[in-house]
From Swiss-Prot:
InterPro entries: Atg5 (IPR007239), ATG5_HBR (IPR048940), Atg5_HR (IPR042526), ATG5_UblA (IPR048939), Atg5_UblA_dom_sf (IPR042527), ATG5_UblB (IPR048318). Gene3D superfamilies: 3.10.20.620, Autophagy protein Apg5, helix rich domain, Phosphatidylinositol 3-kinase Catalytic Subunit, Chain A, domain 1. Involved in autophagic vesicle formation. Conjugation with ATG12, through a ubiquitin-like conjugating system involving ATG7 as an E1-like activating enzyme and ATG10 as an E2-like conjugating enzyme, is essential for its function. The ATG12-ATG5 conjugate acts as an E3-like enzyme which is required for lipidation of ATG8 family proteins and their association to the vesicle membranes. Involved in mitochondrial quality control after oxidative damage, and in subsequent cellular longevity. May play an important role in the apoptotic process, possibly within the modified cytoskeleton. Its expression is a relatively late event in the apoptotic process, occurring downstream of caspase activity. Plays a crucial role in IFN-gamma-induced autophagic cell death by interacting with FADD. Coiled coil: none annotated. It is a peripheral membrane protein. This is Autophagy protein 5. It comes from the Eukaryota. One of its GO terms (biological process) is mitophagy. It comes from Bos taurus. The gene is ATG5. The keyword Mitochondrion does not apply. There is a cross-link at residue 130 (Glycyl lysine isopeptide (Lys-Gly) (interchain with G-Cter in ATG12)). It is found in: Cytoplasm; Preautophagosomal structure membrane. The modification N-acetylmethionine is found at residue 1.
Amino acid sequence: MTDDKDVLRDVWFGRIPTCFTLYQDEITEREAEPYYLLLPRVSYLTLVTDKVKKHFQKVMRQEDISEIWFEYEGTPLKWHYPIGLLFDLLASSSALPWNITVHFKSFPEKDLLHCPSKDVIEAHFMSCVKEADALKHKSQVINEMQKKDHKQLWMGLQNDRFDQFWAINRKLMEYPAEENGFRYIPFRIYQTTTERPFIQKLFRPVSTDGQLHTLGDLLKEVCPSAVAPEDGEKKNQVMIHGIEPMLETPLQWLSEHLSYPDNFLHISIIPQPTD
């Protein structure tokens, strides 16, 4: 991969200032103060909120505590989506800090998966990494790794260790020089305006005549409604990690540098904010 290490670091160390508030109907023995945290964009809510859980459990009776879950403006937050994706999709036009409501009862079974332990997060994360490598390298790279390499990827993410993670992840970002890129680009496109969870299709980074495909090419093919006509006004923002990459950016470069740790490009299409 081309080595723009500063970009990789900026992506990894991206943080969202967040204020956690206990839901007003939760029963407490004394008033629950809000809890403030800088959330890592590349991680998962249930992986980085142990302190939040402990903070609120201090003012609650044991019998009133069941599985913790989070909500933003009435929408339950899917823990298996990376934090940065959740923010871009649901809250990118709101003021900071991001205000998240904490619940300990009435778990929304229809909307959320249960997350009883960190093992569940690890299993989900590794499943995504394996799916991404199946698309990129027919699973050859991930299958050639040892168990300890898989563990190092996970521990690097869990403990927020950039160098530990990238020592292994860089192997997943390599490809033979003669091929100009991966077999297919692992991506998911999310929209708040549709019931469909996300769009995911096979898409190559290089065209049959050897031209590098761009982000714009991908959107025109799989989500044409996201792209403004040449003479029309822009109706949507296309966001990855809180920024709007230029539509001319090669998809291969984006995949190598702006993928989340699960090796997918998580792309949010959100309505253009009206001033």
